[in-house]
Amino acid sequence: MCGILLHYCPNNNYLNDELIEFPEGTEFGDTTCTNESSIFNKIIPYIAARGPNYSSLRAVKAYRISWFSSVLSLRQPFTKQSINVDDRYFLQFNGELYNKEISQGDNDSLYIASMLQNLKEGMGVIDVIKSLEGEYAYTIYDVNSSKLYFGRDPIGRRSLSYSVTPDNELYVASVTGSAGSFQDCIGGVIYEYDTRTKLLNSNQRSHLPYEVTSEIDLNFTSLSEVSKNLYAVLRDSVKKRVESIHPRHIENSPIAVLFSGGIDCSVIVALICEVLQENDYKCGKPVIELLNVSFENPRTGLFPSDTPDRKLSINSAKTLQNLYPNVDIKLVEVDVPYDEYLKWKPFVINLMYPKQTEMDLSIAIAFFFASRGRGFLTSLNGERTPYQRHGIVLFSGLGADELYGGYHKFANKPPHELVEELTRQINNIYDRNLNRDDKVIAHNGVEVRYPFLDEYVIKLSTAEIPINFKVNKLILRKVASQYLKLDGISSEPKRAIQFGAKSAKMTKDGNKHGTDLLKENRNCS
């Protein structure tokens, strides 16, 4: 994973050719680039936080472009960014690719660079982008055409925003805070900025929108076969996301999971355990860290230990530990006192920009603290010891509600309305969830992966699963009970993180609603 920041400034006559490298451990709080704008300098610390293993600043005077990149190294060989491809292309890549041509020992950034190097006649940058499979964001500058390409994968699993100023300057960044006037990139749109004409084209897409089938199987005759197929693609999705974890430091090898104890994340944990058990570990059990976040809530009077998600996570963790004794499953109880919530609230509000509703904050701040991973392990005798997450790859169950009708508001919809709603949900998830979540989670120097949002899982789930199997996640509950022995967990009701962790409605303001705009000022520090 990497952080991306690009600035094209046609009127910057002070830019010099340079490449400055910053080693691991560099502090960026007061970093300034003397020949760059205040917006660029303001964004640098956000980008650096996303990639703690390496950062660099590259500037090319002839093109009037500056690139700041950071790297969280998860694939070998260690690859610095940005990448100069034969002085023809300049590449920034943030994400993970799962194209079958990429072996476990290959680096996906170098894979893209190789594709650009070996483009056949009649093929171009857009053809390379359309061939990518995985979760990613990118910028590519083509020297010969003087065009800048940037965008996100079709589902939008990595954040990216851009801004074109009245003076035709272009900024592209993974995260911006409230610096400048940025808008989020639409998932799957290939943005093309021509530095000669100063025109931005956003008409190309890397993938057509998904369409949910309206097929109904009233007798449930296909339930067994569909469940089998869904289990297979989900397992494959988890497998390729587990086997592509190769961190730079061995202590970062554990896999972490954002864990509420519900069916979505429990299915992911069970599948990870199945994949891990395929290998012979000679140095002890493989480790999975279940990150459960809970808040002290003065409005309800609840402490973190009292929240619904904490209680459920303890029970679900025990179930998983009993099912998979050959895996060291640690439940990390992340407690957030109210004063800690208040301390970080302005920062998280700024980090999730341009999202600015009460609901966005309650979700974002839960993921911020969960991914930070500072919590406790509780022994069998009830003794708690402080624990800091080691894993830097986090798995999330996001996407299950959108694919399988998990939200309460879907329960009583007639089939044709449910088809329309689920189609809208999966095609808009880049804006509704993913941009915000990636910004706040990646700030902790980790990467999040979404097995339910794998291209093949979405294709099967939208095109081949009858719509009546998607009421209250019927099909997923079938997979959980039949293939993963999660019978007890599979019957648990849906509970949104902000309510399960009690990060919503912290104060006694009875008129506050989730869609209300935040009143607090953003603090960029």
Curated annotation (Swiss-Prot):
<feature type="region of interest" description="Disordered">
    <location>
        <begin position="503"/>
        <end position="525"/>
    </location>
</feature>
<dbReference type="InterPro" id="IPR051857">
    <property type="entry name" value="Asn_synthetase_domain"/>
</dbReference>
<protein>
    <recommendedName>
        <fullName>Asparagine synthetase domain-containing protein YML096W</fullName>
    </recommendedName>
</protein>
<feature type="domain" description="Glutamine amidotransferase type-2">
    <location>
        <begin position="2"/>
        <end position="209"/>
    </location>
</feature>
<feature type="compositionally biased region" description="Basic and acidic residues">
    <location>
        <begin position="506"/>
        <end position="525"/>
    </location>
</feature>
<keyword id="KW-0963">Cytoplasm</keyword>
<keyword id="KW-0061">Asparagine biosynthesis</keyword>
<feature type="active site" description="For GATase activity">
    <location>
        <position position="2"/>
    </location>
</feature>
<feature type="domain" description="Asparagine synthetase">
    <location>
        <begin position="210"/>
        <end position="523"/>
    </location>
</feature>
<dbReference type="InterPro" id="IPR029055">
    <property type="entry name" value="Ntn_hydrolases_N"/>
</dbReference>
<dbReference type="InterPro" id="IPR014729">
    <property type="entry name" value="Rossmann-like_a/b/a_fold"/>
</dbReference>
<dbReference type="Pfam" id="PF00733">
    <property type="entry name" value="Asn_synthase"/>
</dbReference>
<dbReference type="InterPro" id="IPR017932">
    <property type="entry name" value="GATase_2_dom"/>
</dbReference>
<dbReference type="GO" id="GO:0004066">
    <property type="term" value="F:asparagine synthase (glutamine-hydrolyzing) activity"/>
</dbReference>
<dbReference type="GO" id="GO:0005737">
    <property type="term" value="C:cytoplasm"/>
</dbReference>
<dbReference type="GO" id="GO:0006529">
    <property type="term" value="P:asparagine biosynthetic process"/>
</dbReference>
<keyword id="KW-0028">Amino-acid biosynthesis</keyword>
<keyword id="KW-0315">Glutamine amidotransferase</keyword>
<dbReference type="InterPro" id="IPR001962">
    <property type="entry name" value="Asn_synthase"/>
</dbReference>
<dbReference type="Pfam" id="PF13537">
    <property type="entry name" value="GATase_7"/>
</dbReference>
